[in-house]
């Protein structure tokens, strides 16, 4: 039986971010997920600057090896009419691939990862 101070069930962005903070606080943390990472995740592939700040992401480091596409604006308009470009000049969001993003956050957490293992029993 594995022992730890904190068991985080789920290795997605919320679980891995929680694990990272707990590891930084000096706790022995394990993350358990029924999936193996990297995994395909059908989900929107965008993060905002607020997410970048909340997760303390180093965009230069992340973008060096993983998909990171800054979006500074968008086009909008009714069907069949001319589209209007709205450009904010600075990134309002970043395109990412969830399989890369989730794996990066989980690896970066510093927690012990038990992937491919569903939670079947829990004892205190």
Model-derived regions, located:
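Beta1/beta-strand and adjacent pyrophosphate-binding region of the FAD-binding site
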Residues: 1-14, 30
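Glycine-rich FAD pyrophosphate-binding loop
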Residues: 7, 20-42
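Fold-independent oxyanion-binding glycine-rich loops
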Residues: 11-12, 34-35, 79, 117
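Conserved N-terminal glycine-rich FAD pyrophosphate-binding loop of Rossmann-like flavoproteins
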Residues: 35-58
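Conserved N-terminal helical subregion
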Residues: 53, 60-61, 70, 75-124
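Basic, alpha-helical nucleic-acid-binding regions used in initiation and control of genome expression
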Residues: 64
């Amino acid at each position: 039986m594995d022992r730890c101070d904190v068991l985080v069930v789920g290795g997605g962005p919320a679980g891995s971010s929680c694990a990272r903070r707990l590891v930084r606080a000096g706790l022995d943390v394990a993350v358990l997920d029924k999936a193996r990472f990297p995994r395909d995740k059908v989900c929107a592939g965008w993060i905002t600057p607020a997410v970048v700040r909340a997760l303390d992401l180093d965009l230069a480091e992340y973008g060096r090896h993983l998909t990171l596409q800054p979006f500074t604006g968008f086009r909008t308009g009714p069907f069949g009419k001319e589209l209007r470009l709205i450009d904010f000049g600075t990134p309002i969001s970043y395109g990412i691939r969830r399989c890369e993003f989730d794996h990066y956050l989980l690896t970066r957490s510093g927690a012990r990862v038990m992937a491919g293992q569903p939670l079947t029993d829990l004892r205190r």
